[in-house]
């Protein structure tokens, strides 16, 4: 699993990418020659870094098993309150099934 770190690549993903959303997770995705993931949680909604890091770890674990070819995907948590792994996993799987169908 490759993590997106280049600012130019991230800006291109958010400017040109398409998005899907449900109640707790938003996904921005863009077809490209390489693949990579980005995980984000708003610091306005979650003041403590411990909470933000936990949510990002849950999203990473859910996305770890995904085999993506030639897509850059940003996972942004937009829900309220601390989620469980089941909530994150179901949200991400539902959104990814919409991308590939």
Model-derived regions, located:
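Positively charged, solvent-exposed patches that mediate nucleic-acid binding
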Residues: 1-101
